[in-house]
């Protein structure tokens, strides 16, 4: 009975997941005086990461040779890579230190132009896109729950635009797996106690 319940929950979670084609953002200018971020991306449709429709995502670009337009509307896919930047067709994997810098911006730094410039330059440096090294390239912070928002001018995977950062929740499949193992462990424990 428990196996069927767990299987039903797993199947329902897969079927209920939003399709990437419905993820869209509109880009607004934020703090910072570089040719990069901070940008503010307004979620227009389905949730993106921890953000719901109407929320603004404070974010930074990863590539110096990809572009976006303030006021532009873009389709979004989530990945662990900057698509057009770096080696091979799979793109450039997001560096863990870049994740730490982004989380430090979201959780610790005061959001102003000076700090935004430091974050953008540190991210570009970390990703091999130029920029300049500063104290942020050696901070210790969490690298968890950060993904790349790949922006597209047309439907997903059509018309490369910029790659930005976004915080995401713990993946649902991992959470369900942990819950499933917990239930299985409790059942096994009950059997061995008898």
Give the positions of each predicted feature.
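A short, hydrophobic C-terminal helix/tail in secreted or cell-surface proteins
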Residues: 169-187
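Bacterial N-terminal signal peptides
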Residues: 8-16
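Short, surface-exposed polybasic-aromatic patches that bind anionic ligands, especially phosphate groups
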Residues: 22-167
């Amino acid at each position: 009975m428990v196996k069927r319940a767990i299987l039903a929950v797993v199947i329902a979670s897969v079927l209920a997941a939003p399709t990437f084609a419905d993820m869209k953002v509109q880009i607004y200018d934020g703090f910072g005086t570089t040719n990069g971020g901070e940008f503010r991306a307004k979620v227009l449709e389905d949730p993106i990461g921890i953000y719901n429709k109407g929320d603004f995502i404070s974010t930074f670009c990863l590539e110096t040779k990809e572009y976006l337009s303030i006021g532009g509307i873009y389709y979004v896919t989530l990945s662990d890579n900057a698509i057009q930047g770096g080696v091979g067709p799979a793109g450039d994997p997001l560096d863990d230190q870049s994740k730490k810098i982004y989380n430090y911006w979201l959780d610790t730094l005061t959001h102003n132009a000076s700090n935004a410039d430091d974050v953008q330059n540190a991210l570009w440096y970390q990703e091999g896109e130029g920029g300049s090294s500063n104290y942020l390239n050696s901070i210790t912070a969490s690298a968890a729950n950060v993904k790349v928002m790949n922006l597209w001018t047309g439907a997903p995977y059509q018309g490369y635009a910029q790659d930005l950062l976004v915080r995401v929740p713990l993946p649902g499949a991992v959470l369900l797996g942990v819950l499933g193992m917990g239930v299985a462990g409790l059942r096994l424990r009950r059997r061995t106690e008898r």
